[in-house]
Amino acid sequence: MQSRVLLVTALLVLLASARATEGEDPSLLGLMHGYVQHATKTAQDTLTTVREFPVAQQARDWVTGRFTSLKDYWSTLTGKFSGFWDSTFAVTPTPASEAK
C-alpha cells in the first residue's frame, strides 16, 4: 500500500515539475531531455525509499530464508536417493549379438 502511494506521489511530482519547466526550454528535445532526467531521478529516489522500508527488508530476508531452506531440502532429498539413482542407471555392457 505504501509503495503505491509513493509511486503515485512520485508521478504527480514528475508531472508538476514537467509543467513548471515547460516555459524554460522551447525545444521539444530539451523538454524531453529534462523530463527523462527528472523521471530517472524521481524513480531512483522512490526505489531507494522503498528499499529502506523495514517491510522490504523483511521480505528479502524471508525470500532468502525460504530459498536456503529449499536448497537444504533438495540436497537432503538428493543425498538420500543418490545411491538409488546410481545403481539404477549403471551402464551394463550389451553382448555383441544383441547390439545388432
Curated annotation (Swiss-Prot):
Glycans are attached at T94. The most abundant glycoforms are characterized by an O-linked disaccharide galactose linked to N-acetylgalactosamine (Gal-GalNAc), further modified with up to 3 sialic acid residues. Less abundant glycoforms are characterized by more complex and fucosylated glycan moieties. O-glycosylated on Thr-94 with a core 1 or possibly core 8 glycan. Its main location: secreted. One of its GO terms (cellular component) is spherical high-density lipoprotein particle. InterPro entries: Apo-CIII, Apo_CIII_sf. The keyword S-adenosyl-L-methionine does not apply. Residues 1-20 form the signal peptide. It comes from the Eukaryota. It is found in: Secreted. The record marks K41 as: May interact with the LDL receptor. GO terms for molecular function: high-density lipoprotein particle receptor binding; lipase inhibitor activity; phospholipid binding. Keywords: Chylomicron, Glycoprotein, Lipid degradation, Lipid metabolism, Lipid transport, Secreted, Sialic acid, Signal, Transport, VLDL. It holds the Pfam family Apo-CIII. Residues 68-100 are annotated as: Lipid-binding. One of its GO terms (biological process) is lipid transport. The keyword Glycoprotein applies. Component of triglyceride-rich very low density lipoproteins (VLDL) and high density lipoproteins (HDL) in plasma. Plays a multifaceted role in triglyceride homeostasis. Intracellularly, promotes hepatic very low density lipoprotein 1 (VLDL1) assembly and secretion; extracellularly, attenuates hydrolysis and clearance of triglyceride-rich lipoproteins (TRLs). Impairs the lipolysis of TRLs by inhibiting lipoprotein lipase and the hepatic uptake of TRLs by remnant receptors. This is Apolipoprotein C-III. It comes from Acinonyx jubatus (Cheetah). The lineage of its organism: Eukaryota, Metazoa, Chordata, Craniata, Vertebrata.
